[in-house]
Amino acid sequence: MDDYMVLRMIGEGSFGRALLVQHESSNQMFAMKEIRLPKSFSNTQNSRKEAVLLAKMKHPNIVAFKESFEAEGHLYIVMEYCDGGDLMQKIKQQKGKLFPEDMILNWFTQMCLGVNHIHKKRVLHRDIKSKNIFLTQNGKVKLGDFGSARLLSNPMAFACTYVGTPYYVPPEIWENLPYNNKSDIWSLGCILYELCTLKHPFQANSWKNLILKVCQGCISPLPSHYSYELQFLVKQMFKRNPSHRPSATTLLSRGIVARLVQKCLPPEIIMEYGEEVLEEIKNSKHNTPRKKTNPSRIRIALGNEASTVQEEEQDRKGSHTDLESINENLVESALRRVNREEKGNKSVHLRKASSPNLHRRQWEKNVPNTALTALENASILTSSLTAEDDRGGSVIKYSKNTTRKQWLKETPDTLLNILKNADLSLAFQTYTIYRPGSEGFLKGPLSEETEASDSVDGGHDSVILDPERLEPGLDEEDTDFEEEDDNPDWVSELKKRAGWQGLCDR
């Protein structure tokens, strides 16, 4: 600490304090995070992970790491100071005046670039929110606060420990399911929605209704003056099934964001980190399959046309009457050729349908009665890969023996029971909680002037676990590999920490 002079405190949280400091020799300003070190060795190691991860993240859209050291029972992380404040402050300063779309998309593109970088490094941020997005006076946007981040063992893994701020948490975490990089995309969508509306996407008067609204994924539409592409982008990021959400790479290589990477960002920023993304954009273009044409037919047609043109050139010196007769003959021959081709196509099609030596098989377009008959009285069961009975024409039964970890897919009911009588201060430092006797609203920093409704479309019954939630989609980042963890069940951990072991049994 001797090399730094503390100027003032710029933030405070459960971790400790954030200080604005000045380096004694260079007079340069830095932000310093002061973290109280726990007494246990394992917890101390976890606290040190933030410094280790941040030191690896060298990117213009990520808060730069300078150094870290320990003194007097505290860990100090010195990092770049962003003189424009955080995004939450910027949103609140608007006081109801909406941001222009080009500004929103410029900020969002830079956020995507930062998130894409950490995902390429196999890191999940796990607490992306407006307070953790920082601005500089020259227009740069930077992702910060890696205190909740997690390094996965491989790029195709899932994490399973609950971390995050409730307003930005995706449905799969509330449902106690493993999650991957797509949880960060949901949180990024929450920030984009806040930039467009100056409000949280999900607002409620209680934990119960907040969780139910998030699990349903229903949001109010954006203001109508924003473009259709922007509104579609928000909807894509709020897909309940994680595999249906775009990855950061996909966001940067398609649509309006892709155009911004090349056109709207300053040239010096593109020179710094844009080459990789621009290359991905080029590779992603023109991937849609096109209708195939018969090249031999094209060559025949071109040959016929060429010979016709040559004949016309040779006879060009003939009389006007000869030219007219030539044209009439050409028209008649063309009509006859078209008629012959149509008849020929019909006969060829009939021959193909009846020919036994086809390259492509013609599948019968009827209901598969055999399969329906076999499955008519079968019970619907989850199964593994080992068959005990493989008799033809019967339903195969599978054993439950498996070497694969079976995740406990709890419904949000368990969580709701735990939080039934919970103190709303568990919503972390991000939120302003009304004290008892003041209507008990669960409020976020952007819901001070709003009274959220407790109505939830569809009630409890509409919150149904999607059995294909973790099935791989088209995005190559989606996998079905799980991350090993000593404590995969965050709901049980929540019970333990809150001292509510017997609450659910009441």
Swiss-Prot record:
Phosphothreonine: residues bearing it: 161, 479
Post-translational modification: Phosphorylation at Thr-479 regulates its catalytic activity.
Binding site for ATP: 10-18, 33
Cofactor(s) in the UniProt record: Mg(2+)
Listed GO CC annotations: axon; cytoplasm; nucleus
Region (Disordered): 302-325, 441-490
Compositionally skewed regions (Acidic residues) per UniProt: 473-488
GO MF annotations, alphabetized: ATP binding; metal ion binding; protein serine kinase activity; protein serine/threonine kinase activity
Catalytic residues identified in the record: 127 (proton acceptor)
Subcellular localization(s) per the UniProt record: Cytoplasm; Cell projection, Axon
Tissue/organ expression: Up-regulated in malignant versus normal breast tissue. Isoform 2 shows a high level of expression in testis, ovary and brain.
Protein family according to the UniProt entry: Belongs to the protein kinase superfamily. NEK Ser/Thr protein kinase family. NIMA subfamily.
Name by which UniProt lists this protein: Serine/threonine-protein kinase Nek3
